[in-house]
């Protein structure tokens, strides 16, 4: 079972790994059993490996089994060697002590043989090394190695003694005993009685290893093999000598191979050097061949077409004195070196110029991917073109060159004519400053202007063709340091080069416009449409990358704008306002403004959560795609809007909301490319509408700032301070009590409740030219009631007890309620189910949490009918809120329907929570629209510079901004109509407790700024139900922080129900 289950590890082991393991086992067995053949040993090792492989349950077990078997065999070998050594040690020492008793006949006979003795003498020196090498290869023990070393030393001493005791004359032995000396030596070696050599005692295992090594050396050296049986039958001395000889041959072969390799490397290096020299010679010959026909075509650089064109193409060869002395010519007329250099440069440039298709069509069998002359040159170098085609190509090349030179000459003539016409014009500019008179020497002036124009064009051409080989000029702008052009220059678009050169030549130079003329040219009525339409393009000072553009002064921007036509003066003035505002950074400074915007952006990015993809129907997906397409031109400029808005207002809460909306739009834009939808179409439409209001506010503030700077001659900081003071005065004016005429008018409408009606704000449309109030900003209730010129505090119970509700007042209230219901609250418009209608009718009898009760007209009527005769302060406060609700119900009936719908949903959620059943329809406010107040400001650590003004004002230019919500498009109203966008009062947060409302409203008045908060504060927009929920959530958070336990179970209504009613 285990084998079938654990088959995965066996597949991981490769066959060559298994083969290597079996080979190691076979080699170990060969040492133990040398008499067994290699085939049998290999079969035994393979069978053992197969059994271990099949019987193991894992790879580790398999490797462990094979390792243990190999270690066991090695231990057995070591034990055998030690036992054999201990047995042979006494006989070895006995033989070493009887060295002098050995026979001497052998050495004497060998010494008399002239052929054998020199060979023995030559073998004396390598014998010791051979024995040491043999001991190392045989893997002997240290004792055996020491014994062999002693034997070699004894042998060397004995040989020296024999050489000293030799006599000069010896008798020769008869030839009958041995026909030849080599045979005698061979017989002596076979018999094992080689004189002068002590053979070490070797075991059978060591002899077998020695035979195997001799067989391997014979195979490596290329000698014929010796059978194993014959080697085993040889004496040890003979085996050792054969081993040493083969070792020497092997070393000599290795040395020869190394020498051959070195020789081959040297030969290769020599061949490479020769090839490089040949290539250099060929290139030089080709260049000379090319120069020959072209020098014939340009025989002399004086006055002909070729010379003038070459001068235009090579301004770097002009001497440095040309700019200082324009009367002199560019180069000596008869200088052949200059002519050759010009020809070389024109040839290099011709290689990179695109060739018309009509010319290449005349060359037969030309590859289709050939576009320039460089490709043709490469084909010619690779010998892929026949000689007939080469002749045709040379003719077409000269024809093309002639056409280009003629065209350039025409362009140069146009430039000279334009310069001459400008010389004939009056020599004074707009400011009355005289210009230098060069009419006396028009030729010198034309040469100087022509040389300067050539230098500019040539430098631009070289930078575009090959930036790495552009010449480096010195600081004084005279002689260039590097005048070489790379042969591998990039391909340049010659047609665009000629177009740019012609446009630069024909464009007249505009004189600079002073700041006085700049402001005087503005129309008196401030044409806002033309002003801000031209400012859609970024200012020139901010087109540079990085923050370095911020240090460019305004004078530099005016100098760059001086070359533009004067009819764009109005547009440039508005762009200058934006530029000045971004440079100064508003009231806080540019550096602080940029760093603060980065901190706010990082804060928003860390607090937002990745939205969950929505499963929307097809029609809503189409709506989202349409909204993205229409809103993209506006959202592509939100970076600029964020900086401008923060410079103008300094409102961080509204800036955070704008950053949030930009991020939500960006996420949906990125998801739309992948088919992912993270935002509902209703939310996206609301984001688009609110962003357009941001743009409208910034336009109005820029108009006001432009008016203050240009008409009143104020600086940017002073103008911003003046506008801020106007905002403060407007806020104070709104907080003052209403005029007496309005109080009398309200008293005539509600005579029985003067204290209540005196504090009710009128509808915006009832008073002409009245400044609308801030949305969500209720007026503080009066602390004293005025009667004549005296005042008394509200908390006088006697005064309240004397008031009662009369019958005419009740009739007036019923009339108001009937008008409200008649205004437009129809069932088909509200689309409320019958169950919810019942709940709305019984809304007064249901107990509701505080701050979540919405006063409908029915509730107002029921509460009015139940007013007792003795009125308490709480009742007066409740009736004050009811009066406000009546007026707002008449002005906006649809909003009261939405509020009622929210109240019904809220009641269901409260009842579900009390019954410990959490409904599934409860939705929390998305994190993308709400940042907790406890979120700390995070420092900007990223090196991105996406919010710098230079990047903010950069445009993509991919869309035509025809949308009505474009940044600076079509302002038809005046400044006063653009400022404000004030909204209806917010009644979502009106509670029944008047004292609590007073304190809340007073806190709001102290926190809310001027009109930018009127439509930019996410908590004060009455027409945005989403912002109303956000305000409720903020109020709840504040109450939870205080420790109010009465509203712990308050939940928030879902946004989907609200949007269904709105749509």
UniProtKB/Swiss-Prot annotation:
InterPro entries given in the database record: Gal11_coact (IPR033789), KIX_dom_sf (IPR036529), MED15_KIX (IPR036546), Mediator_Med15_fun (IPR008626)
Stated role: Component of the Mediator complex, a coactivator involved in the regulated transcription of nearly all RNA polymerase II-dependent genes. Mediator functions as a bridge to convey information from gene-specific regulatory proteins to the basal RNA polymerase II transcription machinery. Mediator is recruited to promoters by direct interactions with regulatory proteins and serves as a scaffold for the assembly of a functional preinitiation complex with RNA polymerase II and the general transcription factors.
Residue ranges, compositional bias (Polar residues): 176-192, 301-310, 422-442, 461-482, 500-527, 766-776
GO cellular component, one term: nucleus
Entry keyword set: Nucleus, Phosphoprotein
Family recorded in the similarity comment: Belongs to the Mediator complex subunit 15 family.
Modification Phosphoserine, positions: 948
Keyword Nucleus: yes
Bias (Low complexity): 149-175, 311-342, 443-460, 528-542, 733-758
Protein name: Mediator of RNA polymerase II transcription subunit 15
Gene3D superfamilies: 1.10.287.2920, Coactivator CBP, KIX domain (1.10.246.20)
Subcellular location: Nucleus
A Pfam family the protein falls into: KIX_2
GO BP annotation list: positive regulation of transcription by RNA polymerase II; regulation of transcription by RNA polymerase II
Entry superkingdom: Eukaryota
A molecular-function term among this protein's GO annotations: transcription coregulator activity
Gene: med15
Record note on quaternary structure: Component of the Mediator complex. Component of a med15-hrp1 subcomplex, which flexibly associates with the other Mediator components.
Chain segments carrying region Disordered: 149-194, 286-342, 422-482, 500-544, 728-789
